[in-house]
């Protein structure tokens, strides 16, 4: 909510779902469609490290790459305060990993590739 309010002026517009690994956040408002997992424990699923922020979907109607980089900068600044250490993508058909400079962490069946990088190594 802090990012959405500061950057776009939206307040209380995200849906939060708790699960065994952490939380999932979904935002469908205005010019954005986001789905992000905040996993405290991955249990090896997708080869994600524990304490990962996983961008599943990040679609902005305008300035896609710049808004994605801005979101990554926000995570790099604030997420470590809450224990998160990695930024990852899931089944990255949209090529977010290229925009953010993430590295391949898992090559699954049917070209389902996951990418990730420690937040401290992220250069955005």
Where are these regions (language model features)?
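Non-catalytic substrate-recognition and accessory regions of acyl/acetyltransferase enzymes
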Residues: 1-63, 73-124
């Amino acid at each position: 909510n802090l990012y959405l309010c500061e950057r776009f002026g939206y307040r209380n517009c995200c849906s939060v779902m708790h699960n065994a690994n952490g939380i999932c956040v979904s935002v469908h408002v205005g010019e954005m469609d986001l789905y992000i997992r905040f996993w405290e424990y991955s249990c090896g699923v997708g080869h994600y490290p524990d304490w990962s922020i996983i961008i599943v979907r990040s679609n902005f109607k305008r300035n896609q790459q710049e808004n994605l980089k801005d979101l990554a900068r926000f995570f790099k600044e604030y997420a470590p305060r809450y224990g998160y250490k990695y930024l990852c993508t899931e089944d990255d058909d949209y090529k977010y990993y290229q925009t953010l400079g993430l590295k391949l962490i898992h090559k699954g069946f049917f070209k389902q590739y996951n990418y990730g990088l420690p937040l401290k190594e992220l250069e955005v």
